[in-house]
Amino acid sequence: MVTATVLGHWQWGHLQVWQLPHTAGTRGEPQARQVLAPVLGLAPEQLPISRSERGRPQLGRPLEGQDVGWSHSGGHLLVALGQGVRLGVDLERIQPRPRMAEVIARFFHPDEVAWLLGLEEAARQQWFFRVWCAKEALLKAHGHGISFGLHRFAFAPQGQCLQVSVSDPELGPAGSWQLREWAIGADFRAALAWQPL
C-alpha cells in the first residue's frame, strides 16, 4: 500500500493542492489516489480515475463535478483537486538553461518573446520558469499538453503576477483562465491553472 506523506497544502476556494515526496521514475497516480481518497470519501482503489485519449486524468461517476491533476519533478509530487473547474498543475525545477533565449524565440508567443528577450538575464531566467510552468499548467487543464503549441497563447505580468493576455479561440477567452503560482523552496516553481466548467 502506498502512503501519502503530505509536505505542503494550499487551498483557494474549491481548489486544493498537496505536495508529497516522490521517487523519480515512479508514477504519480498511486500517491494521488492516497491523498485524494479521504477527501473524496472513497477508498483509493475505488476512485473513478481514468485517462482521456491524450492521457489527461479525469474523474468519472459519481465525481464528475470534480477535476484532478498531478505533476512531479525532482523528488516532489503535486496533486490538485478542484470542483466545478477544469484544472492543470505543473511543477518545474529551476535550473540553468544555456539556450533559454533560443527556446523563448522558437516556442513562445511573439508578445512573450518581445517581453522576455528585453529583460536582463537574471530577470529573464526568473520569468522564464514562471511562464513555462504556467503554460504547462494551462495546457494540462486544456488536455492537449504542449503539443497544442506554446505560441498559441501568452502570459503577461500584471505587477508581480501572471495572467493570460492572449488566448487561442480553442482555449476560450483569456479572461476565463485563472492562475496561482508559487515557489516550493528555492529550486522549484509551481502553477495551478483553471477554467470554470
Please state what every model-predicted region is.
Residues 1-197:
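Core catalytic alpha/beta fold that binds nucleotide/phospho-ligands
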